[in-house]
Amino acid sequence: MPIQNILLVDDSKTELHLLSDMLTQKGYTVRTAENGEEAMRRLAEAKPDLILMDVVMPGTNGFQLTRAITRDPRFAGVPVIICTSKNQETDRVWGMRQGARDYVVKPVVADELIAKIKALEGAKG
């Protein structure tokens, strides 16, 4: 199943801009949210094909939000890729335990991220 619509969740306007531009240039439709509350509103408006989730955010962090989304039946089948500067093995393992399907470390390398998205497309199909 192809991935077309992506929700980016990051409290950094710079990261949102960079990732949004990168993904838009590759043909994806991108919506953004700057925190957990806004992300949940965006999810209620339209279910994306993929969520790219930062970890360090005010309020609900990305690990907590990933757990909430992946356990919510309304969003069943929507994969989450953690996209963060946290590069410790314990962070990666914890992110996967919260329900993330993959983990990308910032600064994001475009080819790596696109390859991970394409791999998820194959897994969803």
Please place each PLM-identified region on the residue numbering.
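Receiver (REC) domain active-site loop signature in two-component systems and cognate sites
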Residues: M57
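Short, glycine/charged-rich "phosphate-handling" switch motifs in NTP-dependent
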Residues: R101
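Short hydrophobic/Thr-rich beta-strand motif most characteristic of the beta2 strand and flanking loop
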Residues: G27-E34, R42
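Charged docking surfaces used in two-component/phosphorelay signaling
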Residues: H17-Q25
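C-terminal output helix
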Residues: P107-K118
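Active-site beta3 strand of CheY-like receiver
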Residues: A46-L52
